[in-house]
């Protein structure tokens, strides 16, 4: 099924029952669970569901869960107790399971046949309490899981499963992600630092560091013919500032920007890296801070973090993977400054250069402007304004004893006025529930100033991702009440291990 967004992945559908009811019932369970899988696949799930034979005993369950854990293509398991499946049989299997779990609380029939219902029907269709038995053991074992309730034909059920699958795809990709840091983090900045060993333990991502001189060698080795081809692509794809066109006064700067992109692409490809960071304080032999190169690489799905921010680079990569095939975009972002007019408080988000063009449906303009930081030549960048759309803004921070996700839903809006003198790509948004509550809660949670902003996924995928990755989540949305949020954060702080100071 190569038309799926994730043809390389699959999720397994496990049905629980027992031999108490006889072979005819087990045959019916198998037929009906297969029909559910076929219906869900036909409903447009992003990851193919694979039906597995009905499970009736502890040995079979443990083997199936162990097999799922050992199968790279399997990124998650959906469990459903069609009849009553005594949950002690699931204990060892659930303890062996190392893949995300979704508990689907559904049944084969949409309605009850009131006039003909008998005990044969009742014995076959008893997920109402069979799933409660399974739920008890999952809760007793504290298994991270998502519970979806409703008939499998319900569009809301399909959307919930699809969101969970997308989160599972993001986590599966992250567990094989290799990230390269070109240089270290920005000097004296706290939130971009962190425990890279803990991140690999928790998320599975390998984080490696190379000197910027290694990238500089690649830049020097780029063939001029390859630069010619990429420059032609730039000229065709973007509204080019006249000074950057062939024969223009700054055309050589565009050619050097193309060299940076080609060098970065080859380095990432050869090292099997799918995320990377740069740092304007550590540019070595590079003549420009990479701008258009980073923007185009993000547009192709690479994760990125500025100033050595590897946590945000991993997060951008994960969210881009979750959003594969969806409208909208995902980008590295930074809350830059506020519009505090009481009638409409807004955030203006941007960065020096590096905002992903997937956030706009317009043709970006390719420009060159001075950059005060870095002490290098003026960098080439794409300039645009993000399209109005619902969005979620997510940050990942190291709290010392755990990793925390902080997320805020928002509405991207058009700027109240044009921005003719702002030489960078940008987004303007109204955070939920409003700026005062959102910013106060974000700061109280220790949320970072670098984030992944997405108009493609929602808080639903982020919540599922946090749970399956074992990350603490602080979600700020339209339902957030400030005092309650602050009280919850303070209560969390009181449960942390005692500090040495």
Swiss-Prot record:
BP GO terms, sorted: L-arabinose catabolic process to xylulose 5-phosphate
Pathway: Carbohydrate degradation; L-arabinose degradation via L-ribulose; D-xylulose 5-phosphate from L-arabinose (bacterial route): step 1/3
Gene Ontology molecular function terms on file: L-arabinose isomerase activity; manganese ion binding
Binding positions (Mn(2+)): 307, 334, 351, 450
Cofactor note: Binds 1 Mn(2+) ion per subunit.
InterPro entries: Ara_Isoase_C, AraA_central, AraA_N, AraA_N_sf, Fuc/Ara_isomerase_C, Fucose_isomerase_N/cen_sf, Lara_isomerase
Task of the protein: Catalyzes the conversion of L-arabinose to L-ribulose.
Annotated EC: 5.3.1.4
Protein's gene: araA
This protein's name: L-arabinose isomerase
Catalytic activity: beta-L-arabinopyranose = L-ribulose
HAMAP family named in the record: Arabinose_Isome
Cofactor(s) the record lists: Mn(2+)
Any one cellular-component term (Gene Ontology): cytosol
Keywords per UniProt: Arabinose catabolism, Carbohydrate metabolism, Isomerase, Manganese, Metal-binding
CDD domains membership: L-arabinose_isomerase
Organism: Acidothermus cellulolyticus (strain ATCC 43068 / DSM 8971 / 11B)
Family note: Belongs to the arabinose isomerase family.
Pfam families, alphabetized: AraA_central, AraA_N, Arabinose_Iso_C
């Amino acid at each position: 099924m190569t038309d799926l967004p994730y043809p390389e992945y699959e999720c397994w559908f496990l049905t629980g029952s027992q031999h108490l009811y006889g072979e005819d019932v087990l045959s019916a369970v198998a037929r009906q669970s297969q029909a559910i899988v076929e219906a869900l696949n036909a409903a447009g799930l992003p990851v193919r569901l694979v039906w597995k034979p009905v499970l009736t005993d502890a040995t079979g369950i443990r083997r199936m869960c162990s097999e799922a854990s050992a199968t790279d293509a399997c990124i998650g398991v959906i469990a459903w107790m069609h009849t009553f499946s005594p949950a002690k049989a699931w204990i060892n299997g659930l303890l062996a399971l190392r893949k995300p779990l979704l508990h689907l609380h559904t049944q084969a029939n949409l309605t009850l046949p009131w006039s003909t219902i008998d005990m044969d029907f009742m014995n076959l269709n008893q997920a109402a309490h069979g799933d409660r038995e399974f739920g008890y053991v999952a809760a007793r074992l504290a298994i991270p899981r998502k519970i979806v309730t409703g008939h499998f034909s319900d569009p809301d059920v399909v959307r919930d499963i699809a969101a969970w699958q997308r989160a599972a795809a993001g986590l599966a990709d992250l567990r094989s992600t290799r990230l390269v840091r070109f240089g270290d983090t920005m000097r004296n900045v706290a939130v971009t630092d962190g425990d890279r060993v803990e991140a690999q333990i928790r998320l599975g991502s390998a984080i490696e560091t190379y000197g910027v001189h290694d990238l500089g060698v690649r830049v020097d080795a780029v063939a001029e013919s390859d630069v010619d081809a990429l420059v032609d692509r730039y000229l065709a794809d973007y509204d080019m500032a006249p000074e950057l066109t062939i024969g223009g006064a700054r055309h050589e700067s565009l050619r050097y920007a193309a060299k940076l992109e080609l060098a970065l692409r080859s380095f990432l490809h050869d090292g099997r890296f799918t995320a990377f960071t740069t740092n304007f304080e550590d540019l070595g032999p590079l003549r420009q801070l990479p701008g258009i190169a980073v923007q185009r690489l993000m547009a192709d799905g690479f994760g990125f973090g500025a100033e050595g921010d590897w946590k945000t680079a991993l997060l951008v990569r994960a969210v881009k993977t979750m959003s594969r095939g969806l409208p909208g975009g995902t980008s590295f972002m930074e809350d830059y400054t506020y519009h505090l007019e009481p009638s409409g408080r807004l955030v203006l988000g941007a960065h020096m250069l590096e905002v992903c063009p997937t956030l706009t449906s317009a043709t970006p303009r390719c420009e060159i402007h001075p950059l005060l930081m870095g002490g290098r030549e003026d960098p080439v960048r794409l300039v645009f304004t993000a399209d109005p759309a619902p969005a979620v803004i997510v940050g990942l921070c190291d709290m010392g004893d755990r990793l925390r996700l902080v997320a805020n839903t928002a509405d991207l809006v058009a700027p109240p006025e044009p921005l003719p003198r702002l030489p960078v790509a940008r987004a303007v948004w109204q955070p939920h529930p409003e700026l005062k509550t959102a910013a106060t809660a974000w700061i109280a949670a220790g949320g970072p100033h670098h984030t992944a902003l997405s108009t493609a996924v929602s808080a639903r995928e982020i919540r599922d991702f946090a749970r399956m990755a074992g990350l603490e989540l602080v979600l700020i949305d339209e339902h957030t009440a400030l005092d309650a949020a602050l009280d919850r954060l303070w209560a969390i702080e009181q449960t942390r291990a005692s500090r040495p100071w």
